[in-house]
Amino acid sequence: MRLLVVDDSSTMRRIIKNTLARLDYKDVLEAEDGVVAWKVMAENEDIDVLITDWNMPEMNGLELVKKVRAEAKYEDMPIIMVTTEGGKAEVIVALKAGVNNYIVKPFTPAVLKEKLEDVLG
């Protein structure tokens, strides 16, 4: 299973990647914003799960989610948003855009595990 982690913070990408490795997800790609993520997705069509931050330069996570959902080949791709935007309105906006699950930073490894298992069924 291949995952793509998108966050402008290299520290947060490392935390998520290390957490995923402990959960036995070893095939993890990284991108620092939505523009780079879109390029990574174009070059690696076998990405199974997208984990993205919301607030990033260039193309933010919400814009990335909308772009991903506009492509038929990604319509069923599980997407988890990991962000500091924890208000009810933000969660609703993200879910309407196509996010499958939502994690508010800071979070524990157990939360990431639970949300990932949830989107994977």
State the predicted function of each range.
Residues 10-29:
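Two-component/phosphorelay signaling modules centered on CheY-like receiver
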Residues 30-49:
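Acidic, metal-coordinating helix/loop segments flanking the phosphotransfer/catalytic sites
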Residues 51-53:
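Active-site T/S-Asp motif of two-component receiver
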Residues 56:
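Receiver (REC) domain active-site loop signature in two-component systems and cognate sites
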Residues 107-116:
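C-terminal output helix
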